[in-house]
Amino acid sequence: QFFNRMNIVLFDEPKIKTSLLPFTFTRPVAEIRVGIFTIADKWRRIANSQVSFLTDEYLSKKFASKNSGDNYIINGALLPDEKIFQAIAKLEKGEALVKEGLLLAVRADFLPFYEEIDSFFTEYSIEEY
């Protein structure tokens, strides 16, 4: 498993978060259930790792982010499968994975503030998925 020692942080993409209201008033996007598991549960299972969240400040006390020197920051609305898991695992620090203009994941050595999420990734090397 690629992520055993990696830090996985599931972020709320602002437009997706807004489109999923009222569910996302009380939880991050990745804590919404899809079937019997939440999206975060699915990431925990495929990565065999714990996850944390990058979300609005008022939710961050209950759903905190864990920062390390090597972070996989993944769109919380992204449902994991083996193909996307492999693509994210191949990212080098400073690389981002994007599909049709939507940020899927980035590998970074620090976490942005949630309010800066839209502008944080503009300096990264982009790979189209």
Tell where the protein language model's regions lie, with residue ranges.
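Cationic, low-complexity basic patches in intrinsically disordered or flexible, solvent-exposed regions
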Residues: 2
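Terminal amphipathic alpha-helical/low-complexity segments used for targeting or macromolecular assembly
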Residues: 5-129
